[in-house]
Every structure is written in structure tokens, then in C-alpha cells.
A protein has these predicted regions:
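Short amphipathic alpha-helix that is part of the acyltransferase structural core
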Residues: 2-59, 184-188, 194-232, 360-383
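A conserved beta-strand-loop-helix scaffold within acyl/acetyltransferase catalytic domains
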Residues: 41-64, 84-93, 226-288
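Conserved acetyl-CoA-binding loop-helix of GNAT-fold acetyltransferases
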Residues: 110-127, 287-290, 296-313, 318, ...
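Extended hydrophobic-aromatic, low-complexity segments
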Residues: 215, 226-228, 250, 261-266, ...
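A short, internal acetyl-CoA/4′-phosphopantetheine-binding micro-motif in the GNAT/acyltransferase core
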Residues: 72-74, 89, 99-113, 285-295, ...
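Core beta-strand residues in small-molecule sensory/regulatory alpha/beta domains
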Residues: 72-75, 255-257
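Acyl-donor-binding surface of acyltransferase catalytic domains
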Residues: 1-13, 88-92, 97-199, 347-351
Length: 383
């Protein structure tokens, strides 16, 4: 296993790179960050792109601490050439999760910048966890996601000691083929309601902001058996519902006809920044879940079918979603039965250790008490 250095050591390694000056970012850097991502993602043929609003929303979120978790590298002319992101999730304690990300200008690759950035990201995640860890906190997990076709990023992750632990498929379905029709039942004039032919006793409703707390509870319960799901806080949920990409008019709720209780949902988004590169418009199903009590009754199929009708009604050419290749609920088979096909693949890499193991890898000078000669230095898009 590759050792993780102390954060001070990792910062010194960044400073040793010739021709680049490193500093923390501020809100004024957001447009430059977005431009660098756009250039690099076009070069890398990323299936999913980062938009300006994505970065703005991250920066402005009360959960984010970009002045700790982000580092920027500029060349001698002041141009931004590299971004490192060690996104520490401070909202969830069941798992102490750090999302590793970043970008290097394509013209500056091969100089060791990405290697040094990833070392800092790992070191920063360890430093944050050690400084903020409390009794009852879960293990530290540091993860990086990358399209499977980006072999250079795969090699970078593996050299840093990360291992591929899971794969996800992007899937799509053209909307020029017929979508099954669900008869309209005019039960509530303000909020249209649809009967679900194959899911007797269940109705579909428009997304209703007044039921957002109930929707969050359904999401949490429905995803409990999904890999690496550690919960969604009310703040995280609210950020999704107010995101520029979220489309409430495409989102659908499923309720039990007898009790009125929510039993499933399909939440959808529009990632317009992806459309030009992929060559078509697309409605994206962000989350699809059904409570265990109502699975096997066609509810998920009905939710997807209704989502597709809404996408098509808005002029979208395709319906898209992402799925865990090892999803335990048989989701992959369901999507294929509805005409979805695989469009791309994503790998998730994880540093294979918990917090206790990582601490043993940290430089001795960074573990001394404050009274010793050394010092401790606390630190910090889907589908």
C-alpha cells in the first residue's frame, strides 16, 4: 500500500514543482475553474461535464469549505493550470467520506502535477479526519471516480494506492420509440394523478414540495441496501431540490392508493452542459427507488415510463440514468427490459484502509503532541 504523507509534506511536494504557484481558492476563482474543467473534459471526452452552476453551487453550499478543501495551481503568467479537490463530507458521520477530484491542463500533463495533487488530496483527507474525529464516527473512506476509458486516470489512482472497488454503467434510451401509455385518472384537479396499470393500489403524482420530507425518508429507506449509501441529510436533499439542474416537472412520486403514503419516487435532472458533446438532449433520472414493501409490483417500471413521457413531452431525445453494475435489486435487468442500453462505464477507486490504518502511514513529525518539536496541522458533480 502506498503511504500517505503528512499534509505539510504533500504541500511541499506541490511547491517543488517548477513553474507553478499554489494557493487556496476564493469565490472569484470560480469562472476560471469552470473554464479549465471545460477544456480538460472536452480533451478527455468525459461523458459527464462540470458546469459553471455546479461549481457555484458547491462553493456557495453551507456544507462546503472550499477554502480548506480546494487548492489551485497557476503558471508563471497567472493562468490556472491545475485544481485539486479533497471534498470532505462533514454532514455524514456514519462514514467519514472524502471525494477526491481535480483537473490538470492537458498541456501540462506528464509533469507529475496530477500525482502530487492526488497525494495532497489523500493527505488532506487524513488530516481533516484526524482533526475532527469524534467517538462514534465511522471509518474514513477516500474515493475517486473516473470513466473507464480514461486509463491515465486509472493508472494515477492505482499508483497512489487506490483500488477499483465498484463499477457503474451510464444507460440511455431513445425516446423516438413508443413509451407505454398509462391512463389518466382525474382524481385531484390541482395535482394530476395517474393510475399504475401493473402496480395495482399505487398512484403516481407530480413532485410536491410540501412532501419533500416524506420523499427524503423514502429515498433513505429505499437506498439502504445500495452499496456505499450512508444517508442523505435534509441540507443535502434541499440542495438537490434547489439545484439549477433539478427538474421538478419531470419528477414523479408513487403513493399507496389506500393510505396515501409515499412508496417510491423518480427524481430527474437536466445536465445541459453534457448535451452538445454527446450530440443529443437528455432527461436524466437522478434517483429511482421503491420501498421494499411495494417492490415486485411494477412501481419502478411505471415511474420510469412516466418519467420518459415527461422527457419526451419536453422535447428530449433520450432518457438517461446510472446504475450500479452489482445493484442488488435487479435494476439493470429492469432498465434493459424498458429499452435502456449501456452508454458508458464509471469506476470507483478507494484507498483500502480505515482511519486507524491511515494514521499509521502519516509522517512521524505530523503525529507529535503540540508540546513536541513538531506540530499538528488540521485540514479538510451523478448518475
Amino acid at each position: 500500500m502506498t503511504a500517505i504523507p503528512a499534509e505539510q509534506t504533500a504541500l511541499a511536494d506541490l511547491d517543488a514543482l517548477p513553474g507553478i504557484t499554489w494557493r487556496r481558492g476564493d469565490r472569484a476563482d470560480v469562472p476560471a475553474i469552470a473554464r479549465l474543467y471545460a477544456e480538460a473534459e472536452a480533451h478527455d471526452r468525459n461523458p459527464e461535464r462540470m458546469s459553471l452552476s455546479d461549481i457555484e453551487e458547491y462553493w456557495d453550499s453551507p456544507r462546503s469549505v472550499p477554502d480548506e478543501d480546494l487548492i489551485l495551481g497557476h503558471d508563471s503568467g497567472g493562468a490556472l493550470v491545475a485544481v485539486g479537490w479533497s471534498g470532505c463530507n462533514r454532514s455524514i458521520t456514519e462514514v467519514r467520506r472524502v471525494h477526491l477530484g481535480g483537473v490538470v491542463d492537458p498541456s501540462r500533463r506528464g509533469e507529475g502535477i496530477g500525482t502530487a495533487l492526488l497525494r495532497w488530496e489523500l493527505a488532506h483527507g487524513v488530516a481533516w479526519d484526524r482533526a475532527a474525529r469524534r467517538e462514534g464516527h465511522g471509518p474514513l473512506q477516500m474515493r475517486l471516480s473516473a470513466p473507464v476509458h480514461q486509463t491515465e486516470l486509472r493508472d494515477l489512482a492505482e499508483r497512489a494506492g487506490l483500488e477499483a472497488v465498484r463499477y457503474f454503467f451510464g444507460m440511455g434510451r431513445w425516446l423516438d420509440t413508443p413509451v407505454p401509455v398509462v391512463p389518466v385518472v382525474p382524481v385531484v384537479p390541482v395535482v394530476p394523478v395517474w393510475s399504475v396499470g401493473s402496480a395495482r393500489g399505487v398512484r403516481l403524482l407530480d413532485c410536491d414540495p410540501s412532501r419533500s420530507h416524506e420523499a427524503l425518508a423514502v429515498l433513505d429507506e429505499g437506498f439502504r441496501d445500495h452499496w456505499a449509501y450512508a444517508g442523505t441529510t435534509p441540507d443535502m436533499w434541499q440542495e438537490q431540490l434547489t439545484s439549477a439542474s433539478f427538474r421538478p416537472d419531470w419528477s414523479v412520486l408513487a403513493v399507496d392508493d389506500a393510505t396515501g403514503a409515499m412508496v417510491g419516487l423518480a427524481m430527474s435532472s437536466a445536465y445541459e452542459q453534457d448535451w452538445a458533446a454527446q450530440g443529443y438532449t437528455e432527461g436524466w433520472t437522478e434517483q429511482l427507488t421503491v420501498l421494499r414493501s411495494h417492490r415486485g409490483r411494477g412501481v419502478a417500471s411505471a415511474l420510469l415510463q412516466e418519467s420518459m413521457r415527461r422527457f419526451a413531452g419536453s422535447g428530449m431525445a433520450s432518457a438517461g440514468l446510472g446504475v450500479d453494475a452489482e445493484n442488488p435489486t435487479g435494476a439493470l435487468r429492469l432498465y434493459e427490459s424498458l429499452g435502456y442500453h449501456r452508454t458508458d462505464s464509471l469506476a470507483v477507486y478507494r484507498y483500502p484502509t480505515d482511519a486507524a490504518d491511515v494514521v499509521q502511514q502519516v509522517d512521524p513529525a505530523d503525529t507529535m503532541d503540540e508540546g513536541d518539536a513538531g506540530s499538528t496541522r488540521p485540514g479538510a458533480p451523478r448518475g
